Amino acid sequence: MADIQTERAYQKQPTIFQNKKRVLLGETGKEKLPRYYKNIGLGFKTPKEAIEGTYIDKKCPFTGNVSIRGRILSGVVTKMKMQRTIVIRRDYLHYIRKYNRFEKRHKNMSVHLSPCFRDVQIGDIVTVGECRPLSKTVRFNVLKVTKAAGTKKQFQKF
């Protein structure tokens, strides 16, 4: 990632102090700033890009101020047209007692996608975790991405 300072406000992680007196120490070279990251627990590994990357995202579960609590769900990526937000589709079966059969149903969910997950494509299976409301429609954060298999456009139950 080239330059993170593209916004009007200075982009920085709030927990990292950047105003160290380097003149007194005699250091003149550009050194890499320390980076804040955390282990979110629940058996999910922190991505390498979250540890070594330079992106700033306050809504990222690994480098931001968001805690994962509540439900852990999975779904298939259907749309990627928003910035740092994707739409996933969750398929399920609903039982109809009169006909003694099941019908297919689905729900779409808006989910925050951290920049540490770089190569996410439509059709990939993502695992998401519940967090505090991040916007009007977003209440979940991507925790893991599994690449799509060869078959597409079929009903998948999670």
Curated annotation (Swiss-Prot):
Q: Does the keyword Cytoplasm apply?
A: yes
* Modification N-acetylalanine, positions: 2
Pfam families per the UniProt record, alphabetical: Ribosomal_S17 (PF00366), Ribosomal_S17_N (PF16205)
Subcellular location per UniProt equals:
Cytoplasm; Nucleus, Nucleolus
Q: How is the polypeptide modified once translated?
A: Citrullinated by PADI4.
Sorted alphabetically, which InterPro entries does this protein's record hold?
Answer: NA-bd_OB-fold (IPR012340), Ribosomal_uS17 (IPR000266), Ribosomal_uS17_arc/euk (IPR028333), Ribosomal_uS17_CS (IPR019979), Ribosomal_uS17_N (IPR032440)
The question of whether Transcription regulation is a record keyword is answered with no
Tell me which residues bear N6-acetyllysine: 38, 45, 58
Q: Which CDD domains match?
A: Ribosomal_uS17 (cd00364)
Alphabetic keyword roster: Acetylation, Citrullination, Cytoplasm, Lipoprotein, Methylation, Nucleus, Palmitate, Phosphoprotein, Ribonucleoprotein, Ribosomal protein, RNA-binding, rRNA-binding
Q: Which residues carry this modification: Citrulline?
A: 22
- Extract the Gene3D superfamilies matched here: 2.40.50.1000
Provide a GO biological process annotation. Answer: ribosomal small subunit biogenesis
Residues recorded as bearing Omega-N-methylarginine in the entry = 69
**Lipid-acceptor residues (S-palmitoyl cysteine):** 60
Task: Give all Phosphoserine modified positions.
Answer: 67, 110
Superkingdom of the source species? Eukaryota
Per the record, GO CC terms? cytoplasm; cytosol; cytosolic ribosome; cytosolic small ribosomal subunit; extracellular exosome; focal adhesion; membrane; nucleolus
Task: Give GO terms: molecular function aspect only.
Answer: RNA binding; rRNA binding; structural constituent of ribosome
Task: Outline what the protein does.
Answer: Component of the small ribosomal subunit. The ribosome is a large ribonucleoprotein complex responsible for the synthesis of proteins in the cell. Part of the small subunit (SSU) processome, first precursor of the small eukaryotic ribosomal subunit. During the assembly of the SSU processome in the nucleolus, many ribosome biogenesis factors, an RNA chaperone and ribosomal proteins associate with the nascent pre-rRNA and work in concert to generate RNA folding, modifications, rearrangements and cleavage as well as targeted degradation of pre-ribosomal RNA by the RNA exosome.
PANTHER family membership:
40S RIBOSOMAL PROTEIN S11 FAMILY MEMBER (PTHR10744), SMALL RIBOSOMAL SUBUNIT PROTEIN US17 (PTHR10744:SF52)
Q: How does it assemble?
A: Component of the small ribosomal subunit. Part of the small subunit (SSU) processome, composed of more than 70 proteins and the RNA chaperone small nucleolar RNA (snoRNA) U3.
Tell me its family. Belongs to the universal ribosomal protein uS17 family.
Record's protein name: Small ribosomal subunit protein uS17
Lineage from the top down? Eukaryota, Metazoa, Chordata, Craniata, Vertebrata
